[in-house]
Amino acid sequence: MPGTRPFTLLVVLVAAASLSAQAPRELVKQAVQTELVASENDHTHWLYFESDSQPSKSVKQWVAEARLVSLSRVIERNGQTVSEAQQKQEMSAFINDPHAQSKQHKSGQHDDEQAAELLKILPDAFLWTKTGESGGTIQLHFKPDPEFHPPDIEARVFSAMEGDMAIDRDQHRIATLKGRLIRDVKIGYGILGELQAGGTFDVERRELSPNVWEIVETHVHIQGHALIFKTISENEDDVKSNFRQIAGTTSLQQAQSELLSLNPDPQKQETADRSAAEQRASAGRDERSTTQPRASHLGKNPKLAQR
């Protein structure tokens, strides 16, 4: 009803003002809780193009998240193009190797669990300050909280960071997280290793479908002589693009067929996808137009003909 619009607008404005008035740490707690719940309930599977660069190796590949594990079609390795025959051979080898699949599955579970644990300490490990709002996000700055006592090595490294985080204003999701190691971190009193101050990390996330957010870029540049994360090197740039949602029941064989149907060049594939989408939209318009009665069939009543 028209009379309810001012009241509805007032409620929206009050809710927005309430969000802005929240203490920075409470904003972070809300975002963390939202992320944990979303992760638990997210059962989407994706196909995407990935470019991953590390000092010792680099790879460009199409990746399909099948039912339990992911299958990769490596297009380029260390700057060298991988032949299509080799691509097929590598995918088939993985499909027929239960041990490799189990190893990937366990590694993924470990990474997810570790990420969740680090996410949980985010509100308390740092002192938070709101620095502004921009583009639908709330900007926050963080620095180590001297009262926080990290429970393990990973948390100790994480809590030695200072940086910035952006939270999506409407969905309370973490959009970006950037940090810099502000002090050296010794592991085992320096005997097991040391990470040097000045190292950085930068993570960007994007909403791919309603309420589904995924990491699209990860940049880690930390100098030292110890690895903290099993699947992330100290120097790595990982960028994902060309996301396409696929069925959660996709088998590895189906994933292989889907991957082989793609153009090795992600830009050309994006152009092909856009063209296909336009053709489907055009076909839909044509179909609707053929089902609508023509004006000549409506008689001579001009008002009826205009409906």
Listing of model-derived features with the role each one plays in the protein:
Residues M1-T4:
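N-terminal secretory signal peptides that target proteins for export/translocation
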Residues A21-E162, D170-A175, R180-G199, E204-S209, ...:
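Structured extracytoplasmic
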Residues E217-H219:
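M16 family metallopeptidases and their MPP-like homologs
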Residues T8-S18:
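Bacterial N-terminal signal peptides
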Residues V212-E214:
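Substrate-binding/catalytic groove segments of enzymes
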Residues P6-F7, P24:
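Short amphipathic alpha-helical segments that mediate assembly, nucleic-acid/protein binding
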